[in-house]
């Protein structure tokens, strides 16, 4: 088995692998969630030695109780078949062996994470979009987008289902917010591209991307339609029909 691949190569690696069986898929989801927590948020609490680039020794990781029953082969399969390319594997030196990291999404500080600075308007993708949900929309209109405890705000270079879009937005998001990247860049807001193609920004000094950088918004579900950035349409919370009209008015306030 070849452990030299990483998240950036998984699309090619997965084509030559059989599709996981249903029970195997359940285990893979469990493993993926455990990896996400350990590599993005919990490394220090779990006592994992994380390098400045976000990599940790896979052998040390697999010794943790939550990873008992999983093998290096299981991890390789999850890395290879993860559609959003969340993880990367690489060979370390003989003393550490195989290393693994999350490509983005950290709440931990990872000073040497492999991020490409996007320093000019020409370097930015033509589209920068953040996916969110109705329950967050009133606050976003008022305060802007927030890092929410992570080191970056996540943006996608397209909408779910667009060609070549693998990560950056959950597929079940209800609202898409389109960002004026050149305007934010001109105001000193930095942007980066992660190893799996997600566009990241820390926002301003308070960790926010303010509403003045919103170009437009689009309702994604149940049908696509433009939304007012003034917040003057009825917030129907379409995916949550249990909300009463009184509750919807309260959400709008």
From Swiss-Prot:
Residue span of region Disordered: 1-29, 225-253
Source domain of life: Eukaryota
Positions of post-translational N-acetylmethionine modification: 1
Membrane-spanning parts: none
Record keyword Acetylation present: yes
Coiled coil: none
Database matches in Gene3D superfamilies: 3.20.170.30, RNA 2'-phosphotransferase, Tpt1/KptA family, N-terminal domain
Chain positions found as Phosphoserine: 240
Catalytic reaction annotation: 2'-phospho-[ligated tRNA] + NAD(+) = mature tRNA + ADP-alpha-D-ribose 1'',2''-cyclic phosphate + nicotinamide
Biased segments, Basic residues type: 243-253
Enzyme Commission number(s) from the entry: 2.7.1.160
Gene Ontology MF: a single term: tRNA 2'-phosphotransferase activity
GO biological process: tRNA splicing, via endonucleolytic cleavage and ligation
Free-text tissue specificity from the UniProt record: Widely expressed. Weakly or not expressed in lung, spleen, small intestine and peripheral blood leukocytes.
Keywords assigned: Acetylation, NAD, Phosphoprotein, Transferase, tRNA processing
Top EC class, one word: transferase
InterPro entries: Ptrans_KptA/Tpt1, RNA_2'-PTrans_C, RNA_2'-PTrans_N
Known function: Catalyzes the last step of tRNA splicing, the transfer of the splice junction 2'-phosphate from ligated tRNA to NAD to produce ADP-ribose 1''-2'' cyclic phosphate.
Family label: Belongs to the KptA/TPT1 family.
Protein name: tRNA 2'-phosphotransferase 1
Organism: Homo sapiens
Lineage: Eukaryota, Metazoa, Chordata, Craniata, Vertebrata
């Amino acid at each position: 088995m070849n452990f030299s691949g990483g998240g950036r190569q998984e699309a090619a690696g997965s084509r030559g692998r059989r599709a996981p069986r249903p029970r195997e898929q359940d285990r893979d989801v469990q493993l993926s969630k455990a990896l996400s927590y350990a590599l993005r948020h919990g490394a220090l609490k779990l006592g994992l030695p994380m390098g400045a680039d976000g990599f940790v020794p896979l052998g040390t990781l697999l010794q943790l109780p939550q990873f008992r029953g999983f093998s290096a082969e299981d991890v390789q399969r999850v890395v290879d078949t993860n559609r959003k390319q969340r993880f990367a594997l690489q060979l370390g030196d003989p003393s550490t062996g195989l290393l693994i990291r999350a490509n983005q999404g950290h709440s931990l500080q990872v000073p040497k994470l492999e991020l490409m600075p996007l320093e000019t308007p020409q370097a930015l993708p033509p589209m920068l979009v953040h996916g969110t949900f109705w329950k967050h929309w009133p606050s976003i209109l008022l305060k802007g987008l927030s890092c929410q405890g992570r080191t970056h705000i996540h943006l996608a270079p397209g909408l779910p289902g667009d060609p070549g879009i693998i990560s950056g937005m959950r597929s079940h998001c209800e609202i898409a917010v389109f960002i004026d990247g050149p305007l934010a860049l001109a105001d000193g807001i930095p942007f980066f591209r992660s190893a799996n193609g997600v566009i990241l920004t820390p926002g301003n000094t308070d960790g926010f991307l303010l509403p003045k950088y919103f170009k437009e918004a689009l309702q994604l579900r149940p049908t696509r339609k433009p939304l007012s950035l003034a917040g003057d349409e009825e917030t129907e919370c379409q995916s949550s029909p249990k909300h009463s009209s009184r509750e919807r008015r309260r959400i709008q306030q």
